[in-house]
């Protein structure tokens, strides 16, 4: 699609076609942000609001999501901070993007696209921020993207979790 390669999606944690489809939905929203010159909030189906969010100024990408898998660092400053909880989005379930940030995401996708959360990382983008305390968390009981190996580090993974 539009010069975006798929090699980065061939990995052990996710099902290839499902992962590409999820990335494509984010990519289309980035395009919409650029085309309409609008800042967008990107939410996945399992995003659950714990607190309201009001106008927080930011430059490119601002994560609102509590880390949903693996180990992470808790920011020690309340409010907007440089992304430190992980070196990549701690799950792509809740973030906002400006038209400038969306343009950077689109350009980088043509260089090295991969699963959305690890694609949006400090190594690729120098201006990712996160808001703490995290006002949104994942409430998931199933996945259509990950393989079992990709689910093992999810905080909500248990014997009732379903891989569809």
Where do the language-model regions lie?
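An acidic/histidine-cluster motif and surrounding catalytic segment
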Residues: 1-43, 47-164
């Amino acid at each position: 699609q539009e010069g975006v390669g798929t090699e980065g999606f061939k990995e052990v944690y996710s099902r290839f076609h499902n992962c590409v489809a999820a990335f494509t939905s984010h990519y289309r929203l980035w395009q919409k942000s650029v085309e309409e010159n609008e800042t967008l909030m990107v939410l996945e189906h399992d995003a659950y609001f714990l607190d309201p969010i009001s106008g927080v100024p930011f430059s490119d990408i601002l994560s609102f999501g509590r880390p949903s898998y693996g180990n992470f660092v808790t920011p020690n400053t309340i409010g907007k901070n440089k992304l430190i909880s992980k070196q990549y989005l701690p799950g792509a379930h809740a973030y906002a993007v400006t038209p400038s940030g969306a343009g950077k995401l689109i350009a980088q996708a043509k260089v090295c696209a991969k699963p959305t959360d690890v694609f949006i990382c400090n190594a690729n983008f120098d201006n990712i921020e996160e808001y703490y305390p995290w006002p949104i968390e994942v409430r998931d009981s199933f996945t259509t993207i990950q393989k079992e190996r990709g689910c093992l580090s999810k905080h909500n993974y248990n014997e009732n979790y379903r891989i569809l």
